[in-house]
From Swiss-Prot:
Cellular component terms per the entry's GO annotation: endoplasmic reticulum membrane; membrane
PANTHER family assigned: DIMETHYLANILINE MONOOXYGENASE
Covalent crosslink: Glycyl lysine isopeptide (Lys-Gly) (interchain with G-Cter in SUMO): K492
Listed cofactors: FAD; Mg(2+)
Chain ranges passing through the membrane: 510-530
Gene Ontology biological-process annotations: energy homeostasis; NADP metabolic process; negative regulation of fatty acid oxidation; organic acid metabolic process; oxygen metabolic process; toxin metabolic process; xenobiotic metabolic process
Function: Catalyzes the oxidative metabolism of numerous xenobiotics, including mainly therapeutic drugs and insecticides that contain a soft nucleophile, most commonly nitrogen and sulfur and participates to their bioactivation.
Topology versus the membrane: Single-pass membrane protein
Entry keyword set: Endoplasmic reticulum, FAD, Flavoprotein, Isopeptide bond, Magnesium, Membrane, Microsome, Monooxygenase, NADP, Oxidoreductase, Transmembrane, Transmembrane helix, Ubl conjugation
Protein name per UniProt: Dimethylaniline monooxygenase [N-oxide-forming] 2
GO molecular function, one term: N,N-dimethylaniline monooxygenase activity
Ligand binding (FAD): G9, A10, G11, V12, S13, E32, L40, W41, N61, T62
């Protein structure tokens, strides 16, 4: 019987895995190589090998109501999008509330994780760690790998002919911390992900000129959406997810293109994606379009070659006197403490069942938590992963046969490539609500909307037409939280609380759309019923 669980890493995934273990009556021990919690979200001035690194100005791309853990809302006075220091504060409050620090061994590095000789029957692991220069071994019944995938920089220098003769400075974006020191420079940022857009926008306020080189372009989205609400609270609803799943793909793409171009015309700004029919994650940036409009940033095509001081682009244009190149080219992931056969990556495909479990193990006692990139917040995602993993360890939830898991992995990879493409940056991409529901279904935590419609129509409407946040997965099933319903119904006031810092006299108005939403939900139920019974 599984009792002792090793948790590798005390970042977001590690903290929620600790809580998942405690909730299920397991005995976790977390090994953290640094001196503190927070992982990626704990800013440090220096870059450390083996540790994720962020720049000082990083702000979350997902809002607080969509990012909090399911039974622990963020304080209502917290801003809707958090600076990294504020998010770290939330993690500290969370860890203190659930008394998680006592399970963590800091400044302890995991050297290797190996199957025990009797693994086929016991499912146990030998975990070798190093602390204070001494190596130790401990036996664990299960292992949760929570070390993240933003550690190993992807720096494809061979794809940039002439880089060896370039006389300027170049580095991966993980080395970037502040814009200070780049005054008057001509800077090229390679890439168009979130980090690339952030760094380019920030540098453009000090540099003489910033260029952004992109192979494929990208949609750019503001954090502010309809009526000033956070983008993800408008985009990630069950109703909109249902439409994206049932409407013809061409219609969905047309709707998405119209939505993305509402802020500004991407073609006019040189940003329109090369393949508009892939569901690539949009860049979240509130400054980039205005910096382009000011001329502080210029979008360029792919780099063809470099000279001592210039950059030649594929369209034949040349930019002279380039001082700095920042490669915002993403990350590869590796787990040097694991055997290569445990987490296989071949042809940009990850062989993990539901992005978590190696399918070939005789006993399902190892799970990767956080090795996923949802089109939404990572925090509720890793929480559900941890909740499912701990129940699998206990034997309450069971995995299917290896054959079934391999077939699911193959099908999932095919769908991912069809939706998101084959590029290295999309290897971990997945749809958000669909994946959350998959995991919730495994543990019995997915709400029954048909039943709720008759028992609690007000809540049912909120669940279906409102934002799909983590509270929904505490309404029923194991780990049910009595505060979940109230958290769902009061989320609007927590959104508005940090914004309403100036007292105004406003007239109260009833939610006139409530009846329309109820009727719409009834229509959906009836349509489903008639389809099910062949009417």
């Amino acid at each position: 019987m599984v009792k002792k669980v090793a948790v590798i890493g005390a970042g977001v995934s590690g903290l929620i895995s600790l809580k998942g273990c405690v909730d299920e009556g397991l005995e976790p021990t977390c090994f953290e190589r640094t001196e503190d919690i927070g992982g990626l979200w704990r800013f440090k001035e220096n870059v450390e090998d083996g540790r994720a690194s962020i720049y000082h100005s990083v702000i979350t791309n997902t809002s607080k109501e969509m990012s909090c853990f399911s039974d622990f809302p963020m304080p209502e006075d917290f801003p809707n999008f958090l600076h990294n220091s504020k998010l770290l504060e939330y993690f500290r409050i969370f860890a203190k509330k659930f008394d998680l620090l006592k399970y963590i061994q800091f400044q302890t590095t995991v050297i290797s994780v190996k199957k025990r000789p009797d693994f086929a029957s016991s499912g146990q692991w030998d975990v070798y760690v190093q602390s204070n220069g001494k190596e130790q071994r401990a036996v664990f019944d299960a292992v949760m790998v929570c070390s993240g995938h933003h550690i190993q920089p992807h720096l494809p220098l061979k794809s940039f002919p002439g880089i060896e003769r370039f006389q300027g400075q170049y580095f991966h974006s993980r080395q970037y911390k502040h814009p200070v020191g780049y005054e008057g420079k001509r800077i090229l940022v390679v890439g168009i992900g979130n980090s690339a857009a952030d760094i380019a926008s920030e540098l453009s306020k000090r540099a003489a000129q910033v260029f952004v080189s992109t192979r494929h372009g990208s949609w750019v989205l503001s954090r502010i959406s309809e009526d000033g609400y956070p983008w993800d609270m408008v985009f990630h609803t069950r109703f909109s997810s249902m439409l994206r799943n049932v409407l013809p793909r061409t219609v969905v793409k047309w709707m998405m293109e119209r939505q993305m171009n509402r802020w500004f015309n991407h073609e006019n700004y040189g940003l329109v994606p090369q393949n508009k029919y892939l569901m690539k994650e949009p860049v979240l940036n509130d400054d980039l379009p205005s910096r382009l409009l000011y001329g502080a940033i210029k979008v360029k095509t792919r780099v063809k070659e470099l000279t001592e001081t210039a950059v030649v682009f594929e369209d034949g244009t040349v930019e002279e006197d380039v001082d700095v190149i920042v490669f915002a080219t993403g990350y590869t992931f590796s787990f040097p403490f694991l055997e290569d056969s445990l987490v296989k990556v071949e042809d940009n495909k990850v062989s993990l069942y539901k992005a978590m479990f190696p399918p070939h193990l005789e006993k399902p006692t190892l799970a990767c938590i956080g090795l996923i990139q949802p089109l939404g917040s990572i925090f509720p995602t890793v929480e559900l992963q941890a909740r499912w993993a701990t129940r699998v360890f206990k034997g309450v939830c069971r995995l299917p046969s290896e054959t079934t898991m391999m077939a699911d992995i193959a099908e999932r990879n095919e769908k991912r490539i069809d939706l998101f493409g084959k590029s290295q940056s999309q290897i971990l991409q997945t749809n958000y609500i669909d994946y959350l529901d998959e995991l919730a279904l495994e543990i019995g935590a997915k709400p029954d909307f048909i039943s709720l419609l008759f028992k609690d129509p007000k809540l049912a409407v909120k669940l279906y037409f409102g934002p799909c946040n983590s509270y929904q997965y505490r309404l029923v099933g194991p780990g049910q939280w009595e505060g979940a319903r109230n958290a769902i119904l009061t989320q609007k006031q927590r959104i508005l609380k940090p914004l309403k810092t100036r007292t105004l006299q406003t007239s109260a108005s009833a939610p006139v759309s409530f009846l329309i939403k109820v009727l719409g939900l009834l229509a959906i139920v009836l349509a489903f019923f008639f389809k099910l019974h062949g009417f």
